[in-house]
């Protein structure tokens, strides 16, 4: 969209590693987005907000387009269905102290993630992007879920269509800009 922005990368999880972060964001989660007096913490909501407020943009699917419902479903599936189980894998394999790690919980949620990932495999069998015949913020959101999976080594379970879709996303200049930061800083 060509918007100017400032990004601050913090060691994860910032509520424990960044003094004063909960004074700014009481729930202590990332992302935390501000636009004037607007403060938001939900990734999909932030994307939807930006596309709606600063559009029109082809990154959004309009209410009058046939794939509008599909677009919203993918946009919100990214966090609620695809990213959520990965947060438990992250917690119980990396973030918790060694004595509190639960490999069986992590393994169960990794299986859950891979089962939910079938929807991406099916959706990308006959199309380049998830909806509306073009790249949208739904692809950005699902792309993050795939990126997190790759970071957690869950990408070993990706099927052929998902692999090809993820490769298309990674080839985009915006993806490359967004992932310039050392992933070790972010996780």
Write out the residue ranges for each language-model feature.
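A generic structural-conservation signal
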Residues: 7, 133, 158, 178-179
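Phosphate-coordinating loops and pocket residues in cytosolic domains that bind phosphorylated ligands
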Residues: 23, 171, 180
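Active-site-flanking alpha-helical
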Residues: 51, 145-146, 179
